[in-house]
């Protein structure tokens, strides 16, 4: 990654696709009427180094919070009750599942078309992918990872594709530590993940 071991004064968010802003709460975005500041000493969502202090509500070790599928109009969850709706499946997942089935049946054009419906829908408006074969499957894996982020699919997808033992061994969690307007790409917890 171009971020590994580097720092920058330029926020990295502008170069990311629209689904990032719909999925993640990050420094400078608005959440529940507040501009979030996920930096060291930040006022709304402050950064906290891993195990530097005991858990503190409203702090982050990655520089990010989850936004996807949350309703900003609802009050914060207290205890074990919430009025937040549970989303079990979305139409985008149905299209991606069908695209993968088409790929497995060597129906390349149908697979491309289905994935591109997800990429080209209103609010996302990304250009279509025209790859085929193994290149298409790599594009598809990335598309699924982004589109279905934090919906509970990736771990099981990786197992189903028999790639978990490759991708998840010696894997590390990364994030951004923002100090005085400088963005630093960091290891969040300094631990290599091991997959059995």
At which residue positions do the language-model features occur?
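Acidic/polar-rich alpha-helix caps and helix-coil junctions
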Residues: 1-196
């Amino acid at each position: 990654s171009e971020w590994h071991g580097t720092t920058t004064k330029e926020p990295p968010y502008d170069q990311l696709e629209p689904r990032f802003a719909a999925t993640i709460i990050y420094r400078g975005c608005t959440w529940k009427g507040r501009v979030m500041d996920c930096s060291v000493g930040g006022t709304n969502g402050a950064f906290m180094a891993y195990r530097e202090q005991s858990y503190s509500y409203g702090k982050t070790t990655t520089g990010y919070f989850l936004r996807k599928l949350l309703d900003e109009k609802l009050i914060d969850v207290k205890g074990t009750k919430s009025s937040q709706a549970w989303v079990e499946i979305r139409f985008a997942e149905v299209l991606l599942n069908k695209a993968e089935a088409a790929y497995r049946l060597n129906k390349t054009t149908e697979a491309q078309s289905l994935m591109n419906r997800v990429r080209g829908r209103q609010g996302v408006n990304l250009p279509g992918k025209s790859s085929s074969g193994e290149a298409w499957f790599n594009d598809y894996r990335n598309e699924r990872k982004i589109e279905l982020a934090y919906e509970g699919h990736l771990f099981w997808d990786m197992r189903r594709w028999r790639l978990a033992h490759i991708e998840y061994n010696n894997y590390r969690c990364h994030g951004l530590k923002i100090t005085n307007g400088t963005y630093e790409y960091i290891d969040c917890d300094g631990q290599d993940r091991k997959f059995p």
